[in-house]
């Protein structure tokens, strides 16, 4: 499953759980908060595995079966019969990823249950498929489809890997669109789920580089629109979390949009959201990149140099245009994920059939990003007042 289990608590209580209450000026309800463990497990459609079955499937949780680890515990590769979902005797059949909870780990039973609550009932091409779970004595495990290409993080940042090959421009746009579709689905009626932890390590890629969102341990039911939760214990990942969420605890769907904007910057620049190995002023990607997002000429200075001539300059400018709006300080100024999807669809079309335009010779920025009229802005899901390019 890749390294999708990194620590993500910004302000953690001794219990490790973040208590949510609704803003006094708005009202809503969270169905998940009132569900018991029994109700969640009885309502899911995925399989309940015995611990012995998963022990056999992973070859006794051997160290050479480990494909990832983090706050939750370890993720193991395993194999099941595709028809019966029983363990196979040889390394053949359906490849699975088994996430095993560490009883003394950073994350706990509540997040395990949250994953089952959402992935056990939701189905979408851009969400990782949950195949089953195990609840036996102190054992807590989750069984997923195996994502052969690992995480987006592994394809953007070398992290000491000598055989590293950065993701191509075309695939970066594809991954961005896939992830946006998954997030838009979560925000849509009647799902209304706030994902709360969108980041490169939680976007997994299958053998065809189809991107899917994983790790739903921090997900929450709604609210949508202008309503917001107030979290007394803010959880997420430094560098990705929306500023209003970090500073006030206010959380809604636009908080996810901000985090997605950070991912878009990572795709554009090839830099990590937070990198302590860089000079102090360059460690936070958003803070470093913002001054460059004010004009098309500056944008081209921060594009990942490893891409060489793979991209058209106007494509980079259009991606930056989408990112800068997602990263608006004012949540209401950020586009919805449906709007982001529409804008990325148009960007992908331009990658396949690039426009014959030199961005450095275009005086009208609207023409550069393909937004010639007010109506065109609205169709793309871009706010004319907040376009910074």
Swiss-Prot record:
Subunit structure: Interacts with FLS2. Interacts with PEPR1.
Full protein name: Probable serine/threonine-protein kinase PBL1
Induction per the UniProt record: Induced by flagellin (flg22).
Post-translational modification: Phosphorylated upon flagellin (flg22) treatment.
CDD domains xref list: STKc_IRAK
Main location: membrane
Gene (UniProt): PBL1
Keywords: ATP-binding, Cell membrane, Kinase, Lipoprotein, Membrane, Myristate, Nucleotide-binding, Palmitate, Phosphoprotein, Plant defense, Serine/threonine-protein kinase, Transferase
